[in-house]
Structures are given as C-alpha cells and as structure tokens.
Design a protein with these regions (language model features):
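Sec-dependent signal peptide recognition
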Residues: 2-10
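Cross-family detector of peptidyl-prolyl cis-trans isomerase
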Residues: 4-5, 20-180
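Hydrophobic alpha-helical membrane-insertion segments
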Residues: 11-12, 152
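C-terminal motif of bacterial Sec signal peptides marking the signal peptidase cleavage site
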Residues: 15-19
Length: 180
C-alpha cells in the first residue's frame, strides 16, 4: 500500500514527459512549414507596388494594437456601418495557404453566401470583418497566431498563415451591446 503513492507519482511524471515530447515534436515536425509561413507573411508585409507604396495595409484590433493582419482592398463598398464582433454577417470567401492549397471556399456551395457571427471565426478573420463595410472586397493575410496557431486541422497544418479572398455582402444582425 505504501508503494501506491510512488506508483501514481511515477505515472504522472511519465504522462507529463510524454506530453512535453509531443509538443516538442509538433514544434519540430512543422519547423520548416512554420519558417515558410513566417517568411511569407514578412515578405507580404514588406511588399510595395511600383509607386513604392505598401501593397497591404496593417489592420490591428482595438484590443491589441501590437497584433495585426494584412489587408489589400480590391473594391470599396458603399456601406456605412462596420460590423461589430457580435454582429452576424453575410460573406463570400476563398481560403488558401501560402503554397496555394485551397482549404475552404463558399463558392463550392449552391448559395455562395454564408452567414455567421464575427465572433465565431478565427481572430484574424474577425479583425478583417470589423474593418470592412458592406460591399468591400479584399485579400487578407492572417499570421498563424491570429488563425489556428498550433492546432492541426484536416486541411490546415499547424502554424499556417491563412490567406482569404473576402467580400462582405451584408450585416443582417448588427448588434450593439447594451451596457447594464
């Protein structure tokens, strides 16, 4: 009976060691992919057009001025309201990785417009939406830490920079939070 606490302690230490090894192996397993994505984001962040102007503007959320996504507007809309984080929006989009692999697209659906709350998306996507008006069409580039981070999804590796062609079609649920 005196050996039971020692055995339990040993099991806990082994589980902790295996968990740490798994995290390290994921970090190491995707080392090249992580560097490729970071380099891609940096290259796009530093890219300029023929006039020497930035191709992408940095868009930061009000809650974290040190974080940002990149946005290049193709078409400016005629809307006057910006969606809030709690708003419901209608959008069309195509998402792909820095190697050109498409991981999602609304254009594969019968009705290409999808409706969801800004708050139900990855942080970078919500940042973009809350800085658009109806009719805006743009390309956004989201660094991995504002996307899925180290999460592994079926079509998206950990540490992936996400690129979207995005159009805000409507704001069917513009919600203003009421202060108590």
């Amino acid at each position: 009976m005196k050996k039971l606490p020692a055995i339990i302690t040993l099991i806990i230490l082994l589980v902790a060691a295996v968990s740490c090894n798994d995290e390290e192996s994921t970090w190491e397993k995707y080392k090249d992919w992580r560097h490729t994505n970071n380099d891609f984001f940096t290259q796009k962040d530093n890219s300029v057009n023929a006039n020497g102007e930035r191709e992408y503007m940095r868009v930061s959320p009000v809650w974290d001025a040190g974080s940002y996504i990149l946005m290049k507007k193709y078409k400016s809309g005629n809307g006057t309201k910006y969606p809030l984080f709690t708003s419901t929006v209608d959008v069309t989009y195509k998402g792909y990785l820095c190697n050109g692999t498409v991981f999602d697209s609304t254009y594969t659906y019968t009705d290409s417009i999808v409706t969801f709350k800004c708050s139900s998306t990855v942080t970078g996507f919500a940042i973009a939406l809350t800085n658009m008006v109806v009719g805006d069409s743009c390309e956004i580039i989201i660094p991995s830490y504002l996307g899925y981070g180290e999460q592994e999804l079926s079509a998206i590796n950990p540490y992936s920079t996400l690129i979207f062609g995005l159009k805000l079609r409507g704001i069917p649920g513009y919600e203003i939070q009421v202060k108590p």
